[in-house]
Amino acid sequence: MGFVFTTRSRVIPFPMSKPLLHFTHGNSYPSGSYGRLLDDLRRDFDVRTTDMLGHDPRFPVRDNWHTLIDELIAQLETYGRPAILVGHSLGGAVSMLAAHRRPDLARCVVMLDSPVVAGWRAWVWRIAKLLGLRMRLSPGNVAQRRRNVWPSRAAAFEHFMAKPVFQAWAPGALDDYLDHGLVPQPDGVRLRFDRDVEAAIYSTLPHDMDRVLRDPFPVPVGFIAGTDSTELRQAGLDGTRRLVGDNLVTIAGTHLYPMEKPALTAQLTREMIARLLAQGEEKKAGRPAALFA
C-alpha cells in the first residue's frame, strides 16, 4: 500500500498501481514528441498515448473533428476503466469532446493550451467554412506547403534549429520530435505526420463547441494556458472560462510550452489533476477523497 494526502491533509492509503492517464498530442506532433513531459508524468501515472490522430483509415478527418473523437473513444474503450485525459492543443480539445460524449470513460480532463472556439468566433468560423474560406483562414494552407523532406536527419535538425520557435524548446525536445516524427525514405527522411492530414485537421476546427458549454460539464475539466500563446489569443478565452471556471492556471511560454518547459508543465499538470480528481470525488461523495486513488 502507498499513501496520499487528501485536500484536508489527511493521509489515507491507496493501491500501489499507478492511475491511468491517456495523453493526446497536438496537430502535427506525434505523441513521442512530448517525450520529456511524458517521462516525467510516468513517475506517477500509467501513461498511454494516441500516436497520431487522423492517420487511421477507419477515422478519416471530418468537420468538427467528430471522427477524431470517435478514434479517441475507440482507444479509451479498450482500457476497461476510466482514464485521466490530458492533451495538448488538438489533443486537449478532442479529449474534452470525447469526455463530453462519453463521460464514463474519463475521470477528468486537463487541456494544455487547447482551442475552445465559442460565441461570435464560432459563428465567424462557421460562416468562413460555408464560404469555402476555411483553408485561407486557418494554418491549413501553410501546412500543405511546409517542407517535409530532407536529405538526412542532421539536415532536418539544422532546418528546425534555425527557427526561433524550436530554439525555445528544452534541451533534447527537438531530438524527441525528430526521433518520433521522421521516417527514412530512399532519398533521406520525411515527416511521419501527413501534411494533408495536418491541413485537414486545421480546416475542420469545430465551430459547434457552444453545445458543450450549455450545461455543467459531466467531469471535472481544467486548463493550463501559455501566457504568450498566439493561438490561444486567436481562439479566445471566453469559451474556456465558461468551460473550466476557476480551474485555469497559466504558464510562461508560447503555445508549445510543453516542449519549452516540460518539467514545469508536468508539475502543473499533476497539480491540476489532483485538484480535479478531488473535485470529482467530493461531488460524488460529498467528502474529500484521495487525489491519486
Language-model region placement:
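Active-site loop/oxyanion-hole signature of alpha/beta-hydrolase fold enzymes
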Residues: 48, 52-86, 116, 125-128, ...
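Catalytic histidine-centered segment of alpha/beta-hydrolase-like enzymes
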Residues: 253-266
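Conserved hydrolase catalytic core segment
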Residues: 82-124
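Flexible "cap/lid" loop of the alpha/beta hydrolase fold
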Residues: 108-149, 233
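The conserved beta1-alpha1 loop
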Residues: 22-26, 88, 225
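Conserved alpha/beta-hydrolase catalytic His-Asp/Glu region
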Residues: 144-203
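Conserved serine/cysteine hydrolase catalytic core
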Residues: 172, 182-241, 252
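Conserved HGGG/HGGXW glycine-rich cap/lid loop of the alpha/beta-hydrolase fold
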Residues: 17-59, 81
